[in-house]
Design a protein with these regions (language model features):
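N-terminal carbohydrate-binding/catalytic regions of secreted carbohydrate-active enzymes
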Residues: 49-124
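A short, flexible beta-alpha/helix-coil linker loop
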Residues: 57-61, 147-148, 203
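Alpha-helical scaffolding within the catalytic cores
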Residues: 34-39, 93-97, 121-130, 179-192
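Aromatic- and acid-rich polysaccharide-binding/catalytic face
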Residues: 138-139, 145, 179-203
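Substrate-binding cleft of extracellular glycoside hydrolase catalytic domains
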Residues: 91, 97-176
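N-terminal carbohydrate-binding accessory modules
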Residues: 2-78
């Protein structure tokens, strides 16, 4: 596995120093009133979360729609008091505002380039990720999300994108790839190319 920086432990939660909400394991949510559920959720929010996946969309909007900076700013303001990190999934169509605005709030960023089967869009995504990283808005760079799972690219194509990003952004920014956990076991070249393994686990 490639490690571009020794400080990778910066990206691990120190549970001894982080206030944690007691687990809600065993709670039967079907017996809870709306007010009780809101109270449980409020307890989590007040304690704070390590990170959130950030959605810039509002009712009636979807991926492919271009979102304004003002809308991203409005949504970021809502979550800023409750999280230390945000994850974004794309670097185009308004998603590029997410890490910029997050940094204004002192929030760390895991910034993703959404790769698929459209070469032109892939180029825009990679260019956007590189630009944001070189401008100081990226703490962790994610090159693709479940591309192997969806079979949108070949393994070699993905590896080329990962290599390209690593070659064109500062060495201090770890570069990883996001996929279902088992993809990293059956594709060791991808695992070796990543500074960080970013896995999705579905129960």
């Amino acid at each position: 596995m490639s490690f571009r920086r020794k400080e990778d432990s910066l990206y691990q939660i120190n549970f001894d120093e982080t206030k944690q909400v007691d687990s809600f394991k065993g709670v039967d949510y079907s017996t809870q009133s709306s007010e009780q559920l809101i109270d449980l959720f409020s307890q989590v929010l007040k304690t704070g979360m390590h990170g959130l996946c950030f959605s810039l969309y509002e009712d009636g909007q979807k991926p492919g729609d271009t979102i304004t900076e003002e809308q991203v700013r409005r949504r970021m303001k809502i979550i800023a008091p409750y999280t230390k990190w945000v994850r974004s999934f794309s670097c185009i169509e308004g998603n590029e505002f997410i890490p910029i605005i997050a940094k204004e709030y002192g929030i760390k960023t895991l910034v993703g380039a959404w790769l698929g089967d459209d070469p032109e869009i892939n180029e825009k995504e990679i260019e956007g990720l590189v630009k944001l990283a070189n401008e100081g808005f990226v703490d962790i760079a994610a090159v693709g999300n479940e591309v192997m799972y969806r079979k949108d690219l070949s393994e070699d194509e993905l590896l080329e994108f990962i290599s390209r990003v690593k070659d064109t952004i500062p060495d201090s920014i770890p570069v990883g790839y996001v996929d279902a956990y088992y993809e990293f076991s059956i594709k060791p070249r991808i695992t070796a190319a990543c500074d960080l393994i970013l896995t999705n686990c579905y129960p």
